[in-house]
C-alpha cells in the first residue's frame, strides 16, 4: 500500500521500514570519510512499496483502520484527531472567476492544530501494536514542527519522553507549544543539508544512537505516514463529497499527505486530477525543469525539501505547480480575512495554486484543497504587518505619515568598512578580535568575499557554554545565517522595521562572479566548475545597528535646527 512499505529480501511484502529491525540494520549507513562513527538511515532511501492501482485490499501487508463516528464524550484528546470539516470557499472563488465549486479540507481542526496529528498518532499506535514502542521509551523526531507537536501531544497523553529536533527557521510559536506539551527541543541550522551531521535529520540520529530505548518514528520513511491519509483522510474526503470530486490540490513536505490521499482517490475516483504544490527552492516537483531556480531558501514552513522523501510517490501526482512566499502569505491572509479560516502559510500556498489549477474546471465540477495547519504557529510571522513589510511581502501605505528620514536610502548612512572574519579562524580568536575592536558581531566571508553568515558574541559564548563547540573549533561551526540583508537602495524605513526585531542588519551588494573563479558556500574549497558560467554573490558592504540609525537621525536634526 502507501509508500514506505519495506520489501523483504525473499520478495514478500514486509512491514514498516522503521519497525523492521533487521531491515533497519541493513539500511544503516556509515558516514563519509572523516565521519566514520556516524550511523544513520537516509530519509530518501528508495521506496520498496508494493502498492499497485487495482490491487485487492486483502493483499495489503498493512494493518488498516476504518472510519468510525466520534462518541459524544471523547476518552482523551487523541480521539479529536480526524473527521475534520469540509468548507466551501466563497469569496476567493468568486473573485478568481472560478466556475467550479471550491472546497477546503480544514486540517487545522485536528487536536494539535495540523494535518500532522494524523500521522503522529498513527505512527505511535502502529509502533505500539508491533511491540516496538514500550512504556518508558523515548520518541525522537526530526521535523519542521507540526509532526513534533502531534507526537508531543500523543506522548503527553500516553506518557512517553519526546525529543523534537527542528531547524532554526521554524517559528517560536511552535517551540513554545512543544515546550508546553513537555517535549525537549533541539534546534539545528536551517541551511544544513539534510545529509549533513548538523541537520535536523543528522542530529536526531545521533541522539537515537546515544539514548537507550529511543526510537525515530521517521515520518520520511514510515509507511504509517501515507497510510493515515489512505485509510482516513481520503475516506473522509470521499464521504464528505459523496464520491464526487474532479481535482484535489495538496502541498508536499514529506509527501505522505498527497501520496496517501492520491492513491485512494486513484482507486475510488479515477477521474480526479491530483495537483501537487511545491515551493520555489524545493526539489519535489516534476518535471525537473520546474525546480530550476537560484532561490534556495523560502519562508513558508512545513513544505518542500532538498531531497525526495521515501514516502513521496510522485507517480500519483498528475501535475505539479511551484508556489512562492509572496502569493502564499497573501492567500493565507485572504483565507483568514475573507473566509474566516484561521490557517497557516502553507494553506495559502495550496490555495494560491488551486485558483490557478481550477480554472480548467467547469460548472458542476469540484476542487478540494487541503489546508494543513493553523495560524497559531505564525502569529509573529505572516500575521504581523511588520514582519511582512520587513520581508518585502507587503508595500507600505504611502498615505501613512512617517518621519522625515523614513524614505531616505540606506546609502545616506556613513558606514565604515566592516570587520570580516574568514571561516577558518577559531572561535577563541574571533571572540578576542571582536572584544578588541568593540564589536558584537561580524560577517563571515569566504576567500572571494562572498557572505557565508554572521558570527555574534552571544551566539559563540552560548555555544561554548553549552559544550556545542570548543574554543579551538573554527568559527564556521557557529555561523548565524538568519541575518537580515538590506541593500544600499532600500529605505531607512525598511531598515527601521528590521531593527525592531533584530540587533543588526547586514548591508549587502551583489557582484557577478565567474564560477570557475568563485568559491562555493561550502567552507574550505573552490567551486568545482569549469564552464565559465557566472553567478551572483552577495558581498558585504557594512553592518548597521540601531545606534547607527539613531546617530544619523540625531545628527541630521541638529544640523536642521
Curated annotation (Swiss-Prot):
Organism ancestry: Eukaryota, Metazoa, Chordata, Craniata, Vertebrata
Protein's UniProt name: Cystathionine beta-synthase
Pathway: Amino-acid biosynthesis; L-cysteine biosynthesis; L-cysteine from L-homocysteine and L-serine: step 1/2
Residues annotated as domain CBS: 414-474
SMART domains: CBS (SM00116)
Binding-site list for pyridoxal 5'-phosphate: 146, 253-257, 346
Gene: Cbs
Cofactor: pyridoxal 5'-phosphate
Subunit note: Homotetramer.
Highest rank taxon of the organism: Eukaryota
Record-level GO BP terms: blood vessel diameter maintenance; blood vessel remodeling; cartilage development involved in endochondral bone morphogenesis; cellular response to hypoxia; cerebellum morphogenesis; cysteine biosynthetic process; cysteine biosynthetic process from serine; cysteine biosynthetic process via cystathionine
Modified residues (N6-(pyridoxal phosphate)lysine): 116
Function summary: Hydro-lyase catalyzing the first step of the transsulfuration pathway, where the hydroxyl group of L-serine is displaced by L-homocysteine in a beta-replacement reaction to form L-cystathionine, the precursor of L-cysteine. This catabolic route allows the elimination of L-methionine and the toxic metabolite L-homocysteine. Also involved in the production of hydrogen sulfide, a gasotransmitter with signaling and cytoprotective effects on neurons.
